[in-house]
Amino acid sequence: MEKYILYARKSTDTEDKQVLSIDAQLAELRKFARDNKLVVIDELIEKQTAKSPGRPIFNSMIKRIENNEANGILAWHPDRLARNSIDGGQIIYLLDQTSLNFLRFPV
């Protein structure tokens, strides 16, 4: 069964200010999930840049996927998940290990 964690992130970095607000991301993601009949087990919101590793909400999501609570991530755009090689590598590793089976983006 596909079980998704919805992840919305808005950076505090000035270069990333043009990205949709958290509320706008959530609205689009909820609509996408509803339209595609996706099972969302939780919604996680993070307000931090992804240029450096160590985001607490992202790391907790990774742990939950490793613990088989979910096997999919729903995010507004791939750059909401990772903008550094360590976090990107964690996503790739989970895909390789088949802990993470689904990455969905409405854009």
Which residue ranges define each predicted feature?
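Short, structured surface patches at the beginning of a domain
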Residues: M1-V107
